[in-house]
């Protein structure tokens, strides 16, 4: 979007705010999802049944803007993220669940609609997992918002095109939900 290759960007709000702070004037023009689907999924056999069990564990975390809710959560719990004694070791997780399946991490980042089910498909049962929703922990953020460059909003033709795109997109989502 910064280079002009796109008019509208899909982004998580923390990443968009970080980009805005660095000078990329993004504006959220639509927020289709009201709740976060982000979770931290942990192996019970690693001794984790509550967030109080996180210290001295390895937690897989997505970056590229997805780390902000995690860091907020650890700050709220007063748990260091530098691998020090009493803190957690942060494993920069790819967008897969291999670290929990291969026991490289005690917990991994998952989404309710995707990676959690990859953990299940990978051979772990729900009864073998402790799952912590970012919503339930009070540290969720808005995901998958639609953003534009602020300066484009002064162009009536752009605003019209974006409005038509949003109406069509929401109509498509409504159709998908109903069918």
Task: For every predicted segment, state its role.
Residues 14, 95-179:
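Pocket-lining segment of extracytoplasmic ligand-binding domains
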Residues 1-102, 106-113, 132-134, 140:
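Short, glycine-/small- and polar/acidic-enriched structural segments
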């Amino acid at each position: 979007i910064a280079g002009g290759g796109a008019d509208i960007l899909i982004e998580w709000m923390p990443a968009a705010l970080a980009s805005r702070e660095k000078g990329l004037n993004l504006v959220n023009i639509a927020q289709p999802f009201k709740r976060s689907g982000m979770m931290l999924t942990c192996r019970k056999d690693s001794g984790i049944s509550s967030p109080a069990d996180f210290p001295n564990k390895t937690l897989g975390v997505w970056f590229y803007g997805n780390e902000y809710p995690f860091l907020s959560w650890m700050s709220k719990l007063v748990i260091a993220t530098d691998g020090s004694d009493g803190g957690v070791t942060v494993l920069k997780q790819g967008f897969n669940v291999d670290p929990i399946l291969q026991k490289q991490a005690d917990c991994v980042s998952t989404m309710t609609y995707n990676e959690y089910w990859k953990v299940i498909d990978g051979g772990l049962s729900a009864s073998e997992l402790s799952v912590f929703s970012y919503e339930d922990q009070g540290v969720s953020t808005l995901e998958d918002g639609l953003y534009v460059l602020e300066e484009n909003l002064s162009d009536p033709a752009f605003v019209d095109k974006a409005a038509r795109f949003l109406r069509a997109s929401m109509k498509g989502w409504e159709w998908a939900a109903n069918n």
